[in-house]
Curated annotation (Swiss-Prot):
Function noted in UniProt: Integral thylakoid membrane protein that plays a crucial role in thylakoid membrane biogenesis and thylakoid formation in early chloroplast development. Is essential for de novo synthesis of photosystem II (PSII) core proteins and required for efficient insertion of thylakoid membrane proteins, presumably via interaction with ALB3. May assist synthesis of thylakoid membrane proteins at the membrane insertion step.
Top-rank taxon, per record: Eukaryota
UniProt keyword annotations, A-Z: Chloroplast, Membrane, Plastid, Thylakoid, Transit peptide, Transmembrane, Transmembrane helix
Thylakoid among keywords: yes
Protein name in the entry: Thylakoid membrane protein TERC, chloroplastic
Topology versus the membrane: Multi-pass membrane protein
A GO CC term assigned to this protein in UniProt: chloroplast thylakoid membrane
Skewed-composition ranges (Basic and acidic residues): 76-88
Location(s) in or outside the cell: Plastid, Chloroplast thylakoid membrane
Amino acid sequence: MSLASVIHHGILPPAKSDRIFLTIPVFPPDFRARGWTKSPFSLLINPSLASAANRRLSHLPPIACSRGIDQEDEEKESRELLPHKNDENATTSRSSSSVDSGGLKDYQQEETYKTSFKTVALCVGTAVAFGIGIGLKEGVGKASEFFAGYILEQSLSVDNLFVFVLVFKYFKVPLMYQNKVLTYGIAGAIVFRFTLILLGTATLQKFEAVNLLLAAVLLYSSFKLFASEEDDTDLSDNFIVKTCQRFIPVTSSYDGNRFFTKHDGILKATPLLLTVAVIELSDIAFAVDSIPAVFGVTRDPFIVLTSNLFAILGLRSLYTLISEGMDELEYLQPSIAVVLGFIGVKMILDFFGFHISTEASLGVVALSLSTGVLLSLTNKSSDS
């Protein structure tokens, strides 16, 4: 018989709740050694009271049993309802966690954009301050050469970013590793361009006819930009990609941000290293256009080097800002083609003695690039 029936019939005082707390005294484990002949618990119960309780318990109706059954039914129903509640709680938890993760991702992306914007603004501000300093020390002519070279290099660097986006998409580089690839690519670009500028300066000082060769390169690049159709996102037939894949044994998957990993006991390169190699070779190919273009504006190696350096330093942060919206700058590439064609014609005219001032060159470069950007933004707003 359950304890509830005993309480109901008055043997024990009724409790205010379903939980009964009994205080059991603690007896020493060596009670027999102390001379006690009976169990300590038997000493607590009055024999007459125990027999009376047994007689009354034998005549009680099975009320407590029915109450126990009701309790079991209620517990069973609660157990049956519990999975549904758990499912609802799990669904709510999943939805709330997805919302939280989405909000966290948006917050992190916003913070990344803010940091990149500040970095780009700092690089541009530093370049402007440097150009003003050159103007104060060397005159307006040198400052115009620097700004013309800087704007030209910056626009060509933005054009390079179109190819970087295609390379990252082709090799499926995770977003968290793209900055590492760009860092190595920019470091290699600085070293290569510095070497190329020194060699180009020495060559132009000895061989004036090299100007015609550089002008031909710029005119050919301008023609290619005008004649090229929509960017092909499939780089499987690209010469640089095929060359790197031929000479660099690469695994089929990434291994974190590592450039090398062991595959079947053999040390192989990961696709991340292959991506860096393609980025480096692509920048070398672009430098063949950009370096002659700056030499078409100025022959001062210091101006050529510093304008390149300032244009490249903020390239990684600039990529973060405009990588998602590059498709919207559809008129930027034709405007760059106009600039390259103009610089090529200018170099040919300079070779034959017809000089175009640096200020005029700066105006043509700035006007062409700004027109391309404004046309792209206008076309975007009209489509939306």
